[in-house]
Amino acid sequence: MFFEIALIGTTASGKTYIANTLAREFNAVVLSLDSLCVYKEINIASAKPSQDDLASIKYFGVNLLSVNEHFNVELFIREYQKAKEFALARNLPLIIVGGTGFYLKTMIDGLSEKTLESKSSLNNDEIYALLLNIDPNYKIEKNDTYRLKKWLGIYEQTREIPSEFLKRTQKTGVLKDIEIYELAWDKEILKKRIKTRTKEMLDNGLLDEAKILFSKFDHKLKALNSIGLKECKEYLDGEISFKELENLITIHTTQLAKRQRTFNKKFQSKALEFDKALATLRMKFSIEK
């Protein structure tokens, strides 16, 4: 029977393991809610599902394009629509799983009217200073070039305060009444999991993946400035030691987890302890089935 749930949580919380286990047991379709897994060439840095998982589970949102191609929330919504159509046609459950909460929030709240990205020569610091002066309620990371340019584009084209423009032109969301489950971890235990995962990624060839990526593509591409790859670039350029590389990835990933935890408070979600999550969700799937 078709139904859909979202499974969210911080990086290294075990979301993918839970989703894959449920998908195998209940023949569910999975939509990856991850802004890095969409790229074909980024496998280790994105903690992408294994080749075995991708071969045995019907996945959407993975390996869609190359790192030099642009991906955004509009394209993600189209991928969600494909996943839903596939699951509906076969009467299968759909699991939306990942850590890019912004995509899930947009699917629930809806997109705003499309505007062009600014072609201004202003740098991130200059745009961010303008944003703080004009539109302090608009929340963007200072290094998020794409969203800063989008913000400036709205302001240039409309002369409205962008946060107010977006609220006024917002369309209806594509997700309605979806149950959202969030995997909860003790902060100190999560830090240890992040440290362990960082070591595993390096042992599994993260540096080799980074070498190939930086030899083929412009290192300024947004995808190549993600956590794990940007630190590898510093190491490959001789700016930091291997020990510093491992420590920096761990620190930056821990900081990301904190931001994800804060963002996820925007959702009306049900908290699940990892050890109890499978049993709870198995019961949910069995009832729906």
Curated annotation (Swiss-Prot):
Cofactor(s), names only, from the UniProt record: Mg(2+)
High-level lineage: Bacteria, Pseudomonadati, Campylobacterota, Epsilonproteobacteria, Campylobacterales
Superkingdom, natural source: Bacteria
Residue runs in coiled coils: none
Pfam hit, one: IPPT
GO biological process: tRNA modification
InterPro entries reported for this sequence: Dimethylallyltransferase, IPT, P-loop_NTPase
Name of the protein: tRNA dimethylallyltransferase
Quaternary organization: Monomer.
Region (Interaction with substrate tRNA): 34-37
Top EC class for this record: transferase
Enzyme Commission code(s) on record: 2.5.1.75
Site (Interaction with substrate tRNA): 100
Catalytic activity: adenosine(37) in tRNA + dimethylallyl diphosphate = N(6)-dimethylallyladenosine(37) in tRNA + diphosphate
Residues annotated for ATP binding in this entry: 9-16
Cross-referenced Gene3D superfamilies: 1.10.20.140, P-loop containing nucleotide triphosphate hydrolases
An example molecular function term from Gene Ontology annotations: tRNA dimethylallyltransferase activity
Binding site residues for substrate: 11-16
Entry-linked PANTHER family: TRNA DIMETHYLALLYLTRANSFERASE
Annotated function: Catalyzes the transfer of a dimethylallyl group onto the adenine at position 37 in tRNAs that read codons beginning with uridine, leading to the formation of N6-(dimethylallyl)adenosine (i(6)A).
This protein's UniProt keywords: ATP-binding, Magnesium, Nucleotide-binding, Transferase, tRNA processing
Assigned protein family: Belongs to the IPP transferase family.
